[in-house]
């Protein structure tokens, strides 16, 4: 449940305390777009992202998201409210068991009819915390995903520009909420937030009680830290650039002080041999990321985010009721 007035006050306070804030992105469920109070966020939110997953009633029921309304109701709620925000993004998921090509095609046709400013098509992500029986009941076989991704590219790129392996926008200079791509460092604020600064990943405590105690005593909320070596950081940035569809030799030279082809010789060679990237005859600095590369980037980021979800689940596991 979203307390719209409290969210509006929080955003107003954040902008007052941090005048340098340029964009505010908010995630929500479909039924919130049908709430009359959604107008309170007009002018405060630059990008509204709605987790739809599918417009198919069968899939919505299977994933227990029919509580947010039927596919038609979801469509109507978004259609009414999307003009309130400069950017409206619709999150979809593919790779469900029982999601036939016909169902996916109807979803994509519905998306094109809705015509949001941005579309994100995530592959189904199932973490190690999910029971095997549940995985088997909702996840399609792995060989299905490549064909579905091909359909997504063929249909969406007719009207949208591809921004990353799974993001599409009306223009090629869209702002989209994959801050890890464009920022080597980022700071997370709040309980359970992640930060990457220097060579370290920091995780704030997931206990609201401990977080409040730490902040109240003048400390930060960090509970875990993981230090990464130079090579691991370079591999991480190569993954993100593959996912973004733009691998730049100049970036690695200017930011990390290395020759990409030498520092990650095996990785670059493997990507070339796999047909994921190829030399750009018009720009030696940038590789061309092929459709195979986009699919590879999508699969690798899927596994990366699933691993992050596993970390969250492990850190939440010991929490007691008093921590919530």
Regions found by a protein language model. Name each.
Residues 89, 281-284:
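Short Gly/Ser/Thr- and Asp/Glu-enriched loop/turn motifs at secondary-structure junctions
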